[in-house]
């Protein structure tokens, strides 16, 4: 079976691999361009175009580009090296806008070991940030697990790791200063460079910490770091019978706690992970298996099996493969090793810079796509939806129990999630950022099958996933992750942020002409229009919530029906003739 081949090859870090393509492709030099994300498709599968792309290498060049576009009244959007956001955050309106890539704004500016601060350009990746800090025995305490994100991208979407400790797990809450290039008046030369900090410009700073790219282009960011430390990691798999209670309190006991929930199997993998003294013995390394380069042939075989299960509606085989994935990943410790080579047992102890993030499939030489990141759109590989939202700790137990109730109705219904290693659940806490998290919460990350070629193809047990999605967002008032999700998750989301109006005031101050705003950002910020798109089959890919059968796939037996546990939900359900 292809999965086992994948596991065998996962033991090796390929010396040659094919890093991802540039998200921007142009017909003539840097003009007549299209832009996409690292998965090759946005939630609505639209093609985003721009008149040109600019690649500034210095802040001076960036200032010149923004001034010229402002003078011309051109729309602008920022695109990062890998463009990992699912929603259309990189798209300009129409085809006449300008894309500003931070691909070459990737330098370290200054390091101050005494003050424990590090200033970098916004195109610096998380990997670069971690490595540069480690040179001075410093560490970023919390970060996402994927190191291919850029500093500007993380701040634009509120990216985070997992913790309730300190200031919480969001990267932007460890930022002390932001340099932002915004449109200006003619008297300003059509551009302004804003230097923002909590002490001098608290309102503007709190807006810029999570900005969705609508305030301008982040040029530089200064981080407040901590002395280097070690972590001790242990994964434990348990029955999920008391998971609702454990989820509420576990994060208070373990600084870097998270969970992998396997609801169809009734199991949870607990991450017991905390700091230990720097002189503790251990040279552990976490290189997450799914983030390593994998053979394109193996990925194609695996995808073909997945497509076959869907077309044949073979839930039994889907569940068998899901158990193989989850049990094998657990047995092989998800890619963590005690010495950088092999896993010999828990606990695994290692330096923070070696334990916090990974993503080696990004970093190797071209090999003609013999190997690639698993989701690279140039090959037949993974293609998926990602639904991610944070549920308040006060509501988490009830939400977990509702999911369990769905599983009780049909135990096979959530095997599709376990084929992607289960529901990843991370801790987040309240942030001073206007569009950051509002309170202590658990962030649920659901990754599941999406048809590559047919947006009107229904998915096996899709009604169960849709009900969880709607239950979280509407019953439990969950906040969507700004850089993930399908359209419907953002419906009315801005009303859940108590400081939304304060953010919009700063937006008006920095970009009164809306040159960095688009139809999409106006929709998610509640300024104009709606994020949902109502048309035939729109509910199948989360573009709408169904209100009639035509929004599903009636010719294939999928009709719009109420939810099974959350009756207010409206989901596309397979109805037997």
Swiss-Prot record:
Cofactor: FAD
Sorted UniProt keywords: Ascorbate biosynthesis, FAD, Flavoprotein, Oxidoreductase, Signal
FAD-binding PCMH-type domain span: 46-228
Listed pathway(s): Cofactor biosynthesis; L-ascorbate biosynthesis
A GO CC annotation given for this chain: membrane
S-S bridge residues: none
Catalytic activity: L-gulono-1,4-lactone + O2 = L-ascorbate + H2O2 + H(+)
GO biological process, one term: L-ascorbic acid biosynthetic process
Protein family membership: Belongs to the oxygen-dependent FAD-linked oxidoreductase family.
Protein name: Probable L-gulonolactone oxidase 4
Organism: Arabidopsis thaliana
